[in-house]
A protein has these predicted regions:
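Short basic helix-loop element that most often maps to the first helix and adjoining turn
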Residues: 5-25
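Recognition helix of helix-turn-helix/homeodomain-like DNA-binding domains
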Residues: 28-43
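Helix-turn-helix DNA-binding elements, focusing on the entry/boundary residues of the two helices
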Residues: 19, 30, 48
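DNA major-groove recognition helix of helix-turn-helix/homeodomain DNA-binding modules
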Residues: 46-62
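Residue at a beta-strand N-cap/secondary-structure junction
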Residues: 16, 42-45
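Alpha-helix N-cap/N′ positions at the starts of helices
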Residues: 3-4, 43
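Short, charged recognition helix plus adjacent turn
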Residues: 1-2, 10, 15, 35, ...
Length: 74
């Protein structure tokens, strides 16, 4: 499954300004963040919970930010 992280990416820029600042607040490298946002590495549950805290959204919104499937155009 391929997930669409565009809403998450938008929230990152809105709250943190840059992906680099978000990665720093998450205690992960920018490379790791990039791999996660490009569906090369999975997000772990504690990382999703921490992201919700850093980006100030409710845990009930995790589905919107992390589990929206990417629609493929053929």
């Amino acid at each position: 499954m391929v997930y669409d992280y565009s809403k998450l990416t938008g929230r990152i820029v809105e709250v943190c300004g840059t992906r680099s600042k978000f990665a720093s607040r998450m205690n992960m490298s920018l490379r790791t963040l990039s791999l996660k946002l490009n569906n090369k590495l999975p997000w772990k549950q504690p990382e999703m919970e921490k992201a919700a805290k850093v980006l100030d959204f409710s845990l009930s919104d995790i589905q919107v930010y992390f589990f929206t499937l990417k629609v493929q155009n053929n």
